Amino acid sequence: MAEDRDWQRLDKWLWCAHFMKTRSDCARLVEEGLVRINRQPTDKPHARLRPGDVLTLPLRGEVRVLRVLAMARRRGPAPEAQALYQEVEEAPGADGLRLA
């Protein structure tokens, strides 16, 4: 089912972008307060994510900062998932973020 909205649930976007194997794992990461949207902590998997937002999240022992480029239509292959975001070089405001 294609979504024509200008936003997408945070947990679904993380899952479609291949950051976790299951959507439940994505929701758990968010619920633990480990994710920030535009430097603001969130613990709500249903938070609205839009193109241009900046995500800060801990993955595999490091803090990653990503700019959202597009909303996901489905959980597709890796090249399709990688086109959803762009790595941001600096990690501003990531100082207080706990690593999972």
What are these model-derived regions, one by one?
Residues 1-12, 16, 24, 28, ...:
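Strongly charged
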Residues 33:
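Glycine-centered, phosphate/nucleic-acid-interacting loop/turn motifs that mediate DNA/RNA or nucleotide
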